A protein has these predicted regions:
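Contiguous beta-strand/loop segments that form the cofactor/metal-binding neighborhood of enzyme cores
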Residues: 1-144, 148-179
Length: 179
């Protein structure tokens, strides 16, 4: 099968893809245990490099799965949630899942006031899909958006299964593979 990356990658990587306005990565590297001929790895790491997007600078997004935890996570000081997305910035970090968000280190953000909600609460993705089929608007994660996200996830999986150190370089819709 396609493993955790294909199952949950579209949910967890949605957070950075949406917040950072990401599309096609410029390069991808993947690391993990020796590849299995039939299934995706249970433990892996995929590193995506994205170029500048308008006023947004280049950014690196790293997917960690299974025992492949980030070093900063292992050092402590970060809540040990089962799942989540950790945004690391110059002034601190944001740990998020779909139910909660924590600014870190917490002591540095003790007086922080959350900004007002910018977007209305969306209907369920099932309802958005039904409404779109009826011509009542577009879903938040339509194919124009989710195609880039899903393709990036699958490429991370593919690269994790083809060799020890993998780099794929994307150019628009063209993909080049280098060893």
């Amino acid at each position: 099968g396609n493993g955790t990356m294909s199952d949950l990658g579209s949910h967890w990587n949605d957070l950075p893809f949406w917040a950072l306005q990401l599309k096609a990565p410029l390069a991808i590297e993947a690391f993990g245990p020796p590849a299995h001929p039939e299934i995706a790895p249970a433990t892996m790491r995929a590193v995506y490099e994205f170029g500048a997007r308008g006023d947004l600078p280049p950014v690196r997004v790293t997917w960690h799965q299974g025992d492949e935890r980030p070093e900063i996570w292992k050092q402590g000081g970060i809540p040990q949630w089962r799942d989540g997305a950790l945004f690391i910035g110059k002034k601190g970090m944001l740990l998020s899942d779909y139910g909660k968000h924590v600014l870190l280190p917490e002591k540095d953000f003790a007086g922080f006031t959350r900004p007002p909600q910018k977007f209305p609460k969306a209907a369920s993705h099932h309802q958005e899909w039904i409404d779109a089929c009826k011509g009542k608007g577009r879903p938040l994660a339509d194919f124009e958006y989710s195609g880039w996200l899903t393709e990036s996830n699958h490429l991370g999986n593919v690269l994790a299964t083809v060799s020890d150190k993998k780099i794929a370089v994307m150019s628009g819709v063209n993909l080049s593979y280098y060893r």
